[in-house]
């Protein structure tokens, strides 16, 4: 999945739809939150795949390199 720019861009710009970090882009989720999902299991479906991808991005320290792909939302969504 890391080699498909469209999948990567969609995952980076996907907004978390529920929970403590609802409304935050997946790329801006805290790493401990993604580690928790990794240990408990990612949700089924596309969101789970996107969370797993963002987990791998953060695990490998690539989030700064991918920051230019984040589409502006009109407000600062980095809490």
Where are these regions (language model features)?
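DEDD superfamily 3′-5′ metal-dependent exonuclease/proofreading module
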Residues: 1-79
């Amino acid at each position: 999945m890391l080699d498909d720019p469209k999948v990567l861009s969609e995952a980076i710009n996907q907004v978390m739809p529920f929970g403590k970090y609802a409304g935050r882009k997946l790329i801006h989720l805290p790493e401990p939150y993604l580690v928790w999902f990794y240990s408990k299991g990612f949700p089924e479906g596309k969101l789970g795949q996107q969370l797993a991808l963002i987990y791998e991005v953060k695990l490998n320290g690539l989030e700064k390199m991918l920051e230019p792909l984040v589409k502006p939302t009109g407000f600062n969504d980095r809490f």
